[in-house]
Regions:
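C-terminal catalytic lobe of FAD-dependent flavoproteins
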Residues: 760-856
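N-terminal export/assembly segments and adjacent metallocofactor-ligating motifs
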Residues: 1-257, 265, 269, 273, ...
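Extended redox/cofactor-interaction regions of prokaryotic respiratory oxidoreductases
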Residues: 134-205, 212-217, 242-246, 334-457, ...
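Immediate flanking context of iron-sulfur cluster ligation sites
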Residues: 12-22, 40-57, 861-872, 891-910
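C-terminal accessory/binding modules appended to enzymatic or scaffolding proteins
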Residues: 599-621, 797, 861-900
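Local cysteine-cluster metal-coordination motifs and their immediate loop/turn environment
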Residues: 21-33, 55-65, 871-884, 903-923
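N-terminal leader/propeptide and maturation segments of large enzyme subunits in energy/redox metabolism
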Residues: 86-93, 255-293, 370-371, 375-382, ...
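Long, contiguous, secondary-structure-rich segments that constitute the structural scaffold
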Residues: 491, 497-553, 621-637, 641-797, ...
């Protein structure tokens, strides 16, 4: 093809592509994206420069969104048609929508007739659009008459909701992203913002570059990448946040750093709070929190003296049995110093999901009603009943997330309908969750992805649309509503979540002979219009908004009442709060330790949190191989002191055991926490790490976590558990890795899942970039049955005469290698795995192996002489490894090392998520071998 012809083809191809604006479906920052499609598939994605949440930036996850929508993966992962089974233990079979929904309506009607409306429950998700949320809420509370509807936002945001309501009067974050640019002090607590909200963190970095006087304090049990960037780092002990905030307020009182005029004019309850915090002296608080008095006093002074202090916080405060108190204590500090209701200041809760805010707006929690109304308020119930055209709304709060599954296990709830969430991965005490799902008379799962752990328990699977196919609205952390438009049509027989709920509701109404429908909607816009009307006169009034305004003027913040020309950036600038008195309320917050104390049997504080390039249970990010390159396999991170005390080296397997369950994991050395603490990424469920356990399998990180919850917010303490860690003596081990056709990738993972439960320990992850591969690892007390090993190898194509084989049965070692086109295609090692590192790198680098000759099969760990390990990938966007970064630093003569790396290797110049880690590597001493050279 000539150059001119190729150019013409490219122009025609570009013409065939269309671009539409949408929103990223990951965290609560709510980044705008521009999606490129050829009409059949998503072919690219980039940040929307006009969206006020991100101004064109995307993180590693957002910039690879299009890769999650590849047709080859969609065909393997997506639920594309309804499925049902009538006998547990059998496979589900394909069914029509009519047959499926008729069956569900009849079962619900029969169960409700026999046991009452509270015998059914709905567990929904912060990944639903607001319209989906609204319809399900109305279905449960309005049509069926049960408040047993809760959302996975209970696991992440309900303590923030309760904290805002107790102190400020409404669940309304008072600050906005612009306040990052205007702050004099940023106080980050309970959040690794650099990982969890990376685009917001880019804004923090920019603000600090523009204003060198801007200070940043970080309080966290771990020295995260966020903490390493801080001007002052407070390495508090797990769960001591309330003591820290009370101690800071004590110092502000002692040093006259409170704003008494604001307190007198706009708050109430301060005298009682003073009596609470008077005992939180610097000495007591420093000892409680495990920090120095000097740092505590410095933090309090910076906060109290600042013209504008902005607090950013997330799950470290919320996921706690005292999460509401943590939120309230921090808000107390803001109120007392008048760090609220003005530019650059305020307590700003960062949401973890793309529409957790939207779910709160429609009353998606079991104790709330539409438009921030309270279920316990008779007037609020009457208002909702009038809006919906029903006699009344049930007055008794429904079961919260943990309570719902406990009731399911006890038999009080007979049917559960799970929508767009994966409780068999994300809920605490997985043993109880699975017992509940097995005990249920009927489990309905409404999902886009059939690969989640929860889908294994589904008696009925309802296929739903997902990102790029949905239409509606989402609300991000700063109260900004974005219109979400479909980029592609619905695949297969999928329906929008609200459509499924409405079709079911119409059938139930017919069975109950209702004279008129509560669900007369023909479009998502009609649903949203009713939601909009529910907000009239409320703190989140959006009666001035419409789909048309969102379409023409772009994303808008609430409140946006009728007659307004714009939303409100920040709240309470007039000092008036949505309470009965119009004043904010100080709440007494005595410190309570973690729910589960460490002791001689369980001496470690286990914390959980996010990895940089993964999200939640990984049903979406887990389909993109390159997102595994930064943290390639499940692991528990321990301090160097604890590794040495237990005679552990990196990669050694350990039993991690709590009072509820156990999981074997590789141990890694970390320099980000003190002795006696451990960390596991929250994402690792049984889809990626498992084992035989007691015969029923092991369930990943949340086999360990506690279901104990905050009495006000009902949010469980997922952030902390007491565990013991013992070396796992598993003498037999195996690893298999190889390239897999993309059309078989996820199917292979699913096929390997049952095999994982046959070993004491097993994990299965992806690797690669342009090509994708699967890595399967296992270990056991004894050598695995040869038939099982052969079966696993055959799934990687390691079978037949073309396989190179070395077997030493006496020592239990084997090396089986599949070569194609002169390059490694797949490798299986058992027994001695010491050659894994270089064999895998040869495979990933697609290097010719002819010159290696016998070395391929020699029982040695030594790599070829010219081999050089790339090490871990640091910059995912541009595929830059730690070794390459350290080599460049070794040759650097001086000056700005970060600028040099960005210019020479381009790392940190795309999404910027790796910049905090680049700074960490720059500051760290070079490896000894490099220094010696």
């Amino acid at each position: 093809m000539s150059e001119a012809t190729a150019s013409a083809v490219a122009v025609e191809a570009a013409k065939a592509l269309t671009e539409k604006k949408a929103t990223c479906c990951y965290c609560g920052v709510g980044c705008g994206v521009i999606v490129q499609t050829d009409g059949e598939q998503v072919v690219g994605v980039r940040g929307d420069p006009d969206h006020p949440a991100n101004f064109g930036r995307l993180c590693t996850k957002g910039s690879t969104l299009h890769l999650t929508a590849r047709p080859a993966l969609q065909q393997q992962a997506r639920a594309l048609y309804p499925e049902m089974r009538f006998v547990r233990g059998l496979d589900r079979e394909r069914a029509s929508w009519d047959a499926t929904l008729d069956f569900l309506a009849n079962r619900f009607a029969e169960t409700i007739a026999a046991h009452g409306p509270d015998s059914v429950g709905f567990y929904i998700s912060g990944q639903l659009l607001t319209e989906d949320y609204y319809v399900f809420n109305k279905l449960a509370k309005g049509l069926i008459g049960t408040n047993n509807i809760d959302t996975n936002s209970r696991l992440c945001m309900s303590s923030a909701v309760a904290g805002y309501k107790q102190t400020l009067g409404a669940d309304a974050p008072p600050a906005c992203y612009e306040d990052v640019d205007l702050a004099d002090l940023i106080f980050i607590v309970g959040s690794n913002t650099a990982y969890a909200h990376p685009i917001l963190y880019r804004r923090i970095e920019e603000a600090r570059r523009r204003n060198p006087q801007l200070k940043m304090i970080v309080a966290d049990p771990r020295r995260t990448d966020t903490a390493r960037d801080a001007d002052l780092f407070l390495p508090i002990l797990p769960g001591t946040d309330v003591a820290l905030f009370n101690g800071m307020l004590h110092i502000c009182l002692w040093e006259d750093l409170v704003d008494q005029a604001f307190i007198d004019a706009h708050t109430e309850g301060f005298a009682e709070l003073k009596r609470t915090v008077r005992d939180y002296t610097p000495q007591v608080v420093a000892e409680t929190c495990g920090i120095s008095e000097q740092d505590l006093v410095q933090a309090a002074r910076w906060f109290g003296e600042s013209k504008a202090a902005l607090s950013l916080y997330c799950q470290g405060l919320n996921q706690s049995a005292s999460g509401t108190a943590k939120n309230a204590a921090l808000i107390n500090l803001h109120l007392a110093t008048h760090q609220i209701g003005k530019p650059g200041a305020g307590p700003f809760s960062l949401t973890g999901q793309p529409n957790a805010m939207g779910g709160r707006e429609v009353g998606g929690l079991s104790n709330l009603l539409s438009a921030h109304r309270d279920m316990g308020n008779p007037q609020h119930r009457a208002e909702v009943a009038r809006l919906w055209g029903i006699e009344d709304v049930p007055a008794t709060p429904g079961k919260s997330a943990v309570e719902m599954f406990e009731a399911l296990r006890a038999g009080d709830i007979k049917i559960i309908w799970i929508v767009c969430t994966n409780p068999a991965q994300s809920m605490p005490e997985q043993k109880m969750i699975r017992e509940a799902l097995k005990k249920a008379e009927l489990v309905v799962v409404q999902e886009a992805y059939k690969t989640t752990a929860t889908c294994e328990f589904a008696d009925v699977l309802l296929p739903a649309t997902t990102w790029s196919e949905k239409e509606g609205t989402v609300t991000n952390s700063e109260r900004r509503i974005t219109r979400f438009r479909p980029v592609l049509g619905k695949p297969g027989e999928t329906l929008h979540d609200w459509e499924i709920a409405i079709r079911f509701a119409h059938r139930l109404e017919k069975l109950w002979q209702r004279p008129r429908t509560l669900f007369p909607y023909a479009s998502a816009e009609e649903v949203w219009n009713e939601h909009r009307e529910s907000t009239r006169g409320r703190d989140l009034d959006i009666t001035g908004l419409s789909y048309e305004i969102l379409e023409k003027q772009g994303p808008q913040q609430w409140p946006y009442p009728q007659g307004a020309s714009a939303g409100r950036k920040r709240l309470y600038e007039d000092g008036v709060f949505p309470t009965a008195s119009g004043r904010a309320k100080f709440v007494g917050t005595p410190y309570q330790p973690v729910a589960e104390k460490v002791d001689a049997r369980y001496p470690f504080h286990l914390t959980t949190g996010r990895l940089r390039d993964q999200w939640h249970g990984m049903s979406r990010t887990g389909t993109v191989a390159q997102l595994f390159s930064h943290a390639s396999e499940p692991a528990i991170v321990l301090s160097q002191v604890d590794m040495q005390r237990r005679l552990l080296k990196d990669g050694d397997l350990v039993h991690v055991t709590s009072r509820r369950g156990s999981q074997i994991l590789p141990a890694l050395t970390g320099d980000d926490m003190r002795a006696g603490q451990a960390f596991i990424g929250m994402h690792w469920g049984e889809e990626y790490v498992s084992g035989r356990g007691n015969g029923e399998g092991t369930f990943g990180v949340n086999a360990l976590t506690t279901p104990v919850f905050d009495p006000s917010s009902r949010q469980p303490e997922l952030k902390h558990a007491a565990v013991k860690i013992l070396k796992a003596e598993l003498p037999w081990s195996m690893v298999v890795f190889g390239w897999i056709p993309e059309s078989q990738l996820l199917s292979l993972q699913a096929a390997l899942r049952p095999a994982m439960r046959k070993f004491a320990y097993a994990s299965c992850t992806l690797f690669g970039r342009d090509r994708v591969g699967v890595l399967f690892r296992a270990a056991d007390d004894y050598a695995a049955d040869k038939k099982l090993v052969d079966e696993i190898e055959s799934r990687f194509g390691i079978a037949g005469a073309q396989v190179l084989r070395y077997d030493d049965r006496k020592r239990g070692n084997s090396r089986h290698i599949l070569i194609g086109d002169g390059k490694l295609q797949a490798v299986s090692l058992t027994g001695d795995l010491s050659a894994e590192h270089w064999l895998k790198q040869y495979l990933e680098g697609e290097q010719p192996v002819a010159k290696l000759g016998r070395l391929l099969l020699m029982p040695t760990a030594d790599p070829p002489q010219d081999f050089k390990s790339r090490g871990r990938i640091v910059c995912n966007c541009l595929n830059v490894s730690e070794t390459e970064i350290r080599d460049a630093l070794g040759e650097h003569a001086g000056g700005d090392a970060l600028a040099m790396l960005q210019q020479k290797l381009k790392c940190g110049t795309s999404c910027g998520s790796c910049v905090p880690e680049l700074k960490k590597i720059i500051l760290a001493p070079q490896p000894q071998e490099k220094a010696a050279a």
